[in-house]
């Protein structure tokens, strides 16, 4: 804000506020206000659009690519007889999360999915995951397989359509096993009696509720119809997994990546807003659309790992 005063000679003189005065600070805030508001709105808009695009449009494509590569690797290892049949590989080391372990086929649901080792958000983005503190399907005892209900292909989205008596197959390094559904259960329902000695069971798990808005966990129990395979000892004790591998949990380890990408998005948004006001709208669209979109998708991909793993 400036002021004009009359001098004794009758002329006018412009008086500018000093840099540290309240008037100067108010002028600075008034100038920065539109930039800050526009930058914040742009950052939020890019983030929300990126998350929606990641979950609805890109995640099914990523799931399909992971299934294709996982199936090729699993088929080659099945042919060579090198597929892991326990919690460890041939060198005695714990299997890495994301290792393809088995093929799940549910004819009634038209599901044919490679199952990977592990159940955190990153692994379940590839397909169903085997809970690492349980036995493999076909062995004597209970095995747990978890899968998403909506995002990343939603392989278990119709799991509730299975009824008692329905069957499905699982192929592991020990052969092909058939399971017959016992029943479904939700939170608070009584679990069935544990399988008898020498018998096998699989529990399939996914989320309940509207798509992308999980409210609870659906468990489907199914018993092995034939004889159980050799059962190695567990190396990972039951209920000793990190929280990120439990149902409806996110992976908090990626927070630092989210923060870094958010900083990059905020910086890119600030540059885009400055260019919009000082450079030109057309030039800003041409230069910043690509970088903002790419950074927004990177942020969204990390944010989805913070969301419930059965989403």
Residue ranges with predicted function:
Residues 1-23:
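Acidic/Ser-Thr/Pro-Gly-rich, low-complexity N-terminal segments
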Residues 265-311:
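Alpha-helical transmembrane segments forming the membrane-embedded cores
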Residues 7-9, 17, 34, 287-298:
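Alpha-helical membrane segments of multi-pass proteins
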């Amino acid at each position: 804000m400036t002021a004009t005063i009359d001098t004794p000679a009758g002329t006018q003189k412009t008086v500018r506020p000093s840099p540290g005065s309240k008037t100067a600070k108010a002028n600075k805030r008034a100038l920065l206000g539109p930039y800050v508001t526009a930058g914040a709105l742009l950052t939020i808009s890019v983030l929300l659009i990126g998350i929606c695009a990641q979950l609805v449009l890109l995640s099914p494509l990523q799931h399909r690519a992971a299934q294709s590569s996982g199936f090729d690797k699993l088929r080659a290892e099945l042919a060579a007889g090198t597929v892991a049949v326990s919690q460890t590989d041939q060198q005695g080391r714990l299997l890495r999360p994301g290792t393809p372990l088995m093929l799940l086929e549910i004819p009634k649901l038209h599901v044919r999915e490679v199952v990977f080792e592990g159940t955190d958000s990153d692994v379940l983005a590839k397909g169903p995951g085997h809970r690492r503190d349980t036995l493999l399907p076909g062995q004597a005892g209970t095995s747990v397989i978890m899968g998403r209900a909506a995002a990343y292909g939603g392989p278990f989205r119709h799991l509730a359509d299975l009824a008692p008596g329905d069957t499905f197959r699982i192929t592991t390094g020990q052969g092909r096993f058939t399971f017959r559904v016992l029943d479904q259960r939700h939170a608070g329902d009584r679990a069935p009696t544990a399988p008898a000695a020498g018998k096998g069971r699989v529990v399939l798990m996914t989320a309940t509720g509207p798509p992308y808005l999980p409210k609870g966990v659906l468990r489907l129990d199914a018993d092995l119809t034939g004889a159980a395979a050799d059962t190695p000892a567990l190396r990972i004790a039951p209920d000793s997994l990190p929280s990120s591998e439990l149902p409806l949990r996110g992976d908090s380890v990626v927070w630092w990546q989210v923060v870094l990408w958010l900083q990059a998005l905020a910086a890119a948004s600030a540059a885009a807003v400055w260019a919009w006001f000082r450079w030109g709208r057309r030039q800003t669209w041409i230069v910043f659309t690509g970088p903002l979109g790419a950074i927004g998708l990177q942020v969204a991909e990390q944010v989805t790992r913070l969301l419930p793993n059965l989403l």
